[in-house]
């Protein structure tokens, strides 16, 4: 009866008797390709989100200790550009922030690296990333339009929330504030913990 079934279907007896599914998979190039793809995808799923060796943060320096509160002149601030000193500070709207944890953005190679160690207020308010837009002396920002001042206030709020406020930017001739070790600025309580 089996011979009659084979003759009725017109199939080769060797195809029906030996190998079955495995024989079909390994003799068809398309099936081999699909099997290889399935194995590759399974490997990726099992391997999961393990970072590749080049994606690791081994080249990142360890976090720096929290900077004590103090005030800065524009000249003193310039030292904290991520090159001369590993810490990166920026002034916005008269406030100085430690943006070291945002090194990828504000470090020497970052898209906002031009602002490191500088008063970034004018550049952020006017959306200008040119070094020429930044002043070397204290910038009173009195010539900003109301829209630019509002933009600057938005940046100020974002930095206050995200980064450690370490002091203020001093005008020429202004005396620095003496801060106690325990003193935290009033806006620190509203800021998210690091």
UniProtKB/Swiss-Prot annotation:
Q: What superkingdom heads the lineage? A: Eukaryota
Q: Which compartments is it annotated to reside in? A: Microsome membrane; Smooth endoplasmic reticulum membrane; Mitochondrion outer membrane; Secreted
GO annotation, biological process: heme biosynthetic process; positive regulation of lipoprotein transport; positive regulation of protein localization to plasma membrane
Q: Which parts of the chain span the membrane according to its record?
A: 25-43
Residues that coordinate or bind heme: 112
Q: Its principal location?
A: membrane
* Topology, Lumenal side: 2-24
Under the heading InterPro entries, the entry gives: Cyt_B5-like_heme/steroid-bd (IPR001199), Cyt_B5-like_heme/steroid_sf (IPR036400), MAPR/NEUFC/NENF-like (IPR050577)
Q: Which key words tag this protein in UniProt?
A: Endoplasmic reticulum, Iron, Lipid-binding, Membrane, Metal-binding, Microsome, Mitochondrion, Mitochondrion outer membrane, Phosphoprotein, Receptor, Secreted, Steroid-binding, Transmembrane, Transmembrane helix
Offer a single GO CC term for the protein: endomembrane system
| Membrane topology qualifier | Single-pass membrane protein
Per the record, what ranges lie on the membrane's Cytoplasmic side? 44-194
Region Disordered: what ranges?
Answer: 50-70, 172-194
Question: Molecular function terms in GO for this entry?
Answer: heme binding; metal ion binding; protein homodimerization activity; steroid binding
Q: Which residue positions does Phosphoserine occur at?
A: 54, 56, 180
SMART domains, sorted: Cyt-b5
Q: Hey, which family's this protein in?
A: Belongs to the cytochrome b5 family. MAPR subfamily.
Q: Tell me what else is known.
A: Non-classical progesterone receptors involved in extranuclear signaling are classified in 2 groups: the class II progestin and adipoQ receptor (PAQR) family (also called mPRs) (PAQR5, PAQR6, PAQR7, PAQR8 and PAQR9) and the b5-like heme/steroid-binding protein family (also called MAPRs) (PGRMC1, PGRMC2, NENF and CYB5D2).
The UniProt function text for this chain reads: Component of a progesterone-binding protein complex. Binds progesterone. Has many reported cellular functions (heme homeostasis, interaction with CYPs). Required for the maintenance of uterine histoarchitecture and normal female reproductive lifespan. Intracellular heme chaperone. Regulates heme synthesis via interactions with FECH and acts as a heme donor for at least some hemoproteins. Forms a ternary complex with TMEM97 receptor and low density lipid receptor/LDLR, which increases LDLR-mediated LDL lipoprotein internalization.
On subunit structure and binding partners, the annotation says: Homodimer. Forms stable homodimer through hydrophobic heme-heme stacking interactions. Interacts with FECH; the interaction results in decreased FECH activity. Interacts with EGFR, CYP1A1 and CYP3A4; the interactions require PGRMC1 homodimerization. Interacts with TMEM97 and LDLR; the interaction increases LDL internalization.
Q: What is known of its domains?
A: The cytochrome b5 heme-binding domain lacks the conserved iron-binding His residues at positions 106 and 130.
Query: Could you identify this protein by its name?
Result: Membrane-associated progesterone receptor component 1
Q: Which gene encodes it?
A: PGRMC1
